[in-house]
């Protein structure tokens, strides 16, 4: 059985841990949400192939900047997460997360993930952002960012409703077991030296 290591990165509070808990338990976490989810291993079938998927959570806060890269060696695929309702987390995709991954783990495929999809149409959330002259991140903006950082895919999901959640992990596995043909020739990764 092929083993795949998937590491999840992104700003604090974008929903990385909820994403992992919701996916692995089929339930949104209750009151207590840990800073970092314990590493988790699941046997899944994707495209008829049995896969042992190892999921690694990371802490997004700056306090962990020196420790976080210790989980990067031997990673097969990264999920860079941002919250659809947090423009600053979206900016940090290429302000922080993409450069960090390229430095520590070049040539590893990246999936860009917009979290909190259920909140994009939430009136209260929209009003709170508008007060700061901000708006939720659109699907088109996510696609543009995917191309900018040379990610394999851009996906959106909600850990709360589970919409798009399984697809995120299925596509992460596919990025490893069926790398896109155009990338096979060059490299399988999402890092370009500029």
From Swiss-Prot:
UniProt-annotated location(s): Cell membrane
Residues annotated as binding GTP: 10-17, 57-61, 115-118
Residues with lipidation of kind S-geranylgeranyl cysteine: 191
Locus of motif Effector region: 32-40
GO molecular function annotation: GTP binding; GTPase activity; protein kinase binding
Record organism: Dictyostelium discoideum (Social amoeba)
Listed InterPro entries: P-loop_NTPase, Small_GTP-bd, Small_GTPase, Small_GTPase_Rho
Sequence positions bearing Cysteine methyl ester: 191
Bilayer topology term: Lipid-anchor
Subunit composition and interactions: Interacts with forH. Interacts with pakB. May interact with limE. Interacts (in GTP-bound form) with rgaA.
PROSITE patterns: RHO
Protein name: Rho-related protein rac1A
Function: Overexpression promotes the formation of filopodia and membrane ruffles.
SMART domains: RAB (SM00175), RAN (SM00176), RAS (SM00173), RHO (SM00174)
